[in-house]
Amino acid sequence: MSNNRRGRKNVEKKLIDSAAFLVGSVGPNQLTVRDIADHAGVNHAQIHHYFGGKKGLLIATYKQLAFTHVQQLERRKISPKNLGDEPLASITDDYFKAIIRAVLDGQMYLVRVQIDSNLSMSRTTLKQLAELKNAKKPTSEMKSAVAIAMVVEFGLSSMEQYIDEVLEMTANDKKVFMKYFFEARSLGFDKILK
């Protein structure tokens, strides 16, 4: 790989990493090209040069976040029969926060990046669930099971600190809460797979 190519990849990675870090805290609407460039330590003109502007960088960023999310969940063998023993948001928190911010900002094209790139774990899980039940297509119950898991995961990602603060959660409270969290997350799957 030439030095120019290596330099380009390095700058692109810095910009995507910076955008991924920042978008979860301020959202795509408030995030500026200068914020991203300053955080990455590069000239803001490079965003236009490499990505065609903020929108192109955000698309690349959401694709990378989705790819990392899928990779981490596949590594843990997450499936309808095995949702794991930790909140998924704790594995790829940047992904969850970025998706939440895109939805709140009304930027659904960023949410669609994972679907259009075939990197939606929710869609993959839904497909796996249908296959496990020998269904030609997912049923309303299957979609609901995945939706409940999504609501529980995204809810924890966005509300955990609030819950801890408002309810003054002790270590024991948190232990009981997490037990209920896992039961709620798997509720629909357990009903379908029994």
Annotated model-derived regions:
Residues 1-9:
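N-terminal intrinsically disordered/low-complexity leader segments
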Residues 2, 120-131, 135, 155-194:
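C-terminal peripheral helix-coil segments that are non-catalytic and often amphipathic
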Residues 14, 18-56, 60:
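Helix-turn-helix
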Residues 60, 70-104:
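Hydrophobic alpha-helical connector segments
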Residues 88-124, 160-162:
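Amphipathic alpha-helical segments used for helix-helix packing
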Residues 99-103, 146-153:
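Short alpha-helical scaffolding segments that buttress acidic/His motifs in well-ordered protein cores
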